[in-house]
Structures are given as C-alpha cells and as structure tokens.
C-alpha cells in the first residue's frame, strides 16, 4: 500500500474543513465537519483498522505480525466501543461525509492485502499500518480536533491519540526489523 494514498486521504479530509477561501473557512469547517460527521469518521477509522488487523491475524507469516494484528484489533475494538458508547450517551447519529474518499482507500487497501501472501503480506500490512496511523493522526490534529464542538468527543480524541501514535511506531519498528 502506498504511503502517498493515505497522505492524500488525510489531505483530502483536511480539505473538507479548509477548502473555501479564508474568510469562509470557519463556516465551511463547521458545515463540513460537525460532530455527527466526526463521530462517523472516528468509528470508520477504528472499524477499518480492525478489519485490516484481523486479516493480519490470519494471513501474517510471522508471529510478530500476527501478534501486532491481534493487539491492534483488540485496541481498536476498545476505542470503537468507547466512541459508540459516547455516541449513545450524546444521542448523536453518526453521519459519514457525502464524499467519503477514505472508504475507497480502505477498499483498495483490503484488495491489496487480500492478494498478498507471506512476507509480501507482512510488508504490505506494516506499510499500510504506518501510513494509515500517520494519516489518522494528521487528520485528528489538523481537522477533527479543531472542528469538534462537544467537549467529551474532543476529550476522547485527545485520550486515544497516544495509542494511535504507539501503533504507528510499533508497526514502523517491526517494518524496520524486516529490512529491505
């Protein structure tokens, strides 16, 4: 999976909030990135990483990759549950963006990962995880947090951000250990 695809997705996500001229940026951000949309993105980001990580549990060629997939899946299930509990508490209906480019990126990532085997799968999965977590971290910091209105939703994003960073670094360490 190419890193540029995820970085482009993060930029596209940020563009949803900052696309118009500077004078209208705040109004556009609030219209494009309201809390129900942020809740939907938060849920999707966790669900997608659960899906790719569950694939690593079954397809990983090394114990390290399978274990990393298991940890990521477990962690993202817990974070997704926290998000869903908050959505219920706040009585919010998550509303995905109209043009959710990240969904197409996830579908492509799954195609790539499903077609890879052995060490090629391990490398593709780890590269995906590094790029994916970087894109999510960038989107949280540059777009989602600034647009979030509800204090509890903002608090949840801040609370889980270090785990996203730790996941990115863990995948990078394992990728580095694989060598070229």
Protein language model annotation of sequence segments:
Residues 3-6, 21-180:
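His/Met- and acidic-residue-enriched segments that coordinate or traffic transition-metal cofactors
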């Amino acid at each position: 999976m190419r890193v540029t695809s995820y970085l482009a997705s993060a930029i596209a996500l940020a563009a949803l909030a900052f696309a118009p001229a500077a004078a209208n940026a705040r109004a556009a951000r609030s219209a494009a990135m309201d809390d129900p949309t942020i809740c939907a993105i938060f849920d999707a980001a966790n669900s997608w990483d659960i899906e790719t990580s569950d694939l690593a549990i079954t397809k990983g060629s090394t114990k390290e990759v399978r274990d990393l997939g298991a940890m990521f899946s477990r962690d993202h299930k817990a974070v997704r549950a926290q998000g869903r509990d908050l959505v219920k508490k706040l009585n919010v209906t998550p509303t995905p963006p109209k043009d959710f480019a990240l969904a197409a990126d996830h579908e492509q990532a799954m195609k790539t990962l499903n077609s890879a085997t052995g060490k090629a799968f391990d490398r593709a999965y780890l590269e995906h995880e590094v790029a994916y977590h970087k894109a999510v971290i960038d989107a949280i910091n540059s777009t989602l947090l600034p647009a979030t209105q509800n204090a509890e939703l903002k608090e949840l994003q801040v609370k889980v951000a270090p785990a996203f960073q730790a996941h990115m670094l863990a995948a990078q360490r394992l990728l580095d250990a694989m060598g070229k």
